Structures are given as C-alpha cells and as structure tokens.
C-alpha cells in the first residue's frame, strides 16, 4: 500500500504540468521506450510511470528547443522523477566550499596537449553499471586505480567495486562514500581484489577480501587544487582522475549528447563520483556522440572545451555511458572541486 500511495502522489504531481504532445504521441513514445529499455510495470504502477515519462518528455522538448549545446533525451532514467533519481543513484555527499580558493596551485606534469583521451591508450575498462546502489564513489575509485595500475604494470585489470562497498568501512557502501577514503582503504589493505574474483552485487555485504585475488595495490594518492581546472588538466595528463560533481539536476539525469553545461549547477555541493579520462574541444561529435533529439548546436558565446567523463550507469545513459562536461567554464558542476588520483 505504501508503494501504491507514493505512486499516486507522483501521478497527481506530474499530471498537472502543461502537455506539449498529443496523447497518442506520448503513448507511442512510451511504448517504444519500454521495448527499448525492456521495462514492465504492475497495473498499479503503470499510470504513475507513464505520467512521469510524459513530464520528462516535455522537459526534454523544452530544453532541446532552446538550441543548447547540451542535448537531452529519453534515456534509461525517463520513467523516474528527479527526486527518485537523486535518492537512488547519487552517493557522494561532499561540501567543497571550505577548500576552494584556499590551496596552493598544484602542477603534476609540465607537458600539455590540446587533447587527451586515456581510452585510446588502453587505460580505461568498459563502462560499468552501479544499478540501484549509491556506490558511484567505488566505481570512480576503481576507474582511476585501474588506470594507474595499467601505467605501472602494463595490464588493464577490472577491479572490484563490491570489495570497496563491503570493506571500506570509512565509507557507507550503497549509501555513499568518498574516493579518497577508498584510496586509503586500498593503501592500508595492501590491495583490492579483481572484479572477476569479487563480483558486483549492487548491495551492501560482508567483507570477503582475499589477498590472493588482489588485482592492484597503491602506495599513495594525490589531490588536485580545489576549484582549479588547470590543475585538473595537469592531473588528467598523468592519470584518469576521480572527480566529485553536482549531478543532481534533471538535465544531467536525461543527458544524451553534446557538451553538458548546467547554469544552476553548484561547484560546492557535490553528490556524484565519476572519472575524468580526458579532455578536448569541439562539438563532441568525434567522441561517440549519440543520436539526440536536437542538433545541440553551440552558440557563439558558448565554450566548446570539454572534459571526457566516464559514468557508472551503463551504456544506455549519455554517450554510451560517457558525458562531455564543460571545461574552463567557471568550474561548472564542481568538476575540479574535489578531484584526486592514486599512485601505484
């Protein structure tokens, strides 16, 4: 009954918005979307999810009609509200306000380039999926650790997020955590198990780390100057970098392609851990741009520099699991506010 009551509230709240399509258009779009994403609902749930989908469809249409460089679409999160999305998929809670502007500028390499992409160098594992577990911090941690191990040992090994969720006790498993705490666990534990030996379950469990299954070790980690995108660029030239961002907005939830810029984003209140694997400039069409619903053309005043960011929501979200986030645009969404990378 609680689930039904909750869905009834959702049904009422989303049904009041002004509709932009005919009922037939909504129904056909929802039917196609359910087939594409292999979704099914109980009879009690269908009506609420349908109305949420319609509201998200309207939001996508309104956003894309403005010709933003950010293109939204009806991705795998199109049947949930923004509140549900935030409560289920965002698991890093961090206030960076005390750090920004208080640290000495850190430079990690003297070399620089117009672009960088660790994927092309073989340092990045395929996109993973955290499921309905707020363990984003663990995926960000394994991603940067996999990159550091690759550079040191010459082999790309997929590492265990479940190991971190179960055993990194400074963190809170599926209820959230910080990448720096996870680095400290790996350092103090003298290793992290491989993904194959300690597979992901998307739930909290008992720690079952086995040293004989360790896939990588770390000696330390480095932090990027809080708020400095030039320091972050220097770090990304050294290794894939774990970053915390503000991903709370509906525009991030429904991102499909283009360069992501959200004027309402916070650079201090961060709620999602992801992995910066490179940077570049341009429209983003050469970085795996998917078929969005609008052109996503850059306006003359818009920056076309971006960070290449690996997410942990599967390949149905974004550009095959990636997002291009605005670069050198006032630290949008806090991309450089809390960034760090490990050292083998």
From Swiss-Prot:
A cellular-component GO term for this protein: extracellular space
Carbohydrate attachment residues: 297
Keywords: Disulfide bond, Glycoprotein, Hydrolase, Lysosome, Phosphoprotein, Protease, Signal, Thiol protease, Zymogen
Protein's cellular compartments: Lysosome
Organism of provenance: Dictyostelium discoideum
Gene name tied to this protein: cprE
GO terms for MF: cysteine-type endopeptidase activity
PTMs per UniProt: Glycosylated; contains GlcNAc-alpha-1-P-Ser residues.
EC number from the UniProt entry: 3.4.22.-
Keyword field contains Signal: yes
Identification of the protein by name: Cysteine proteinase 5
Family: Belongs to the peptidase C1 family.
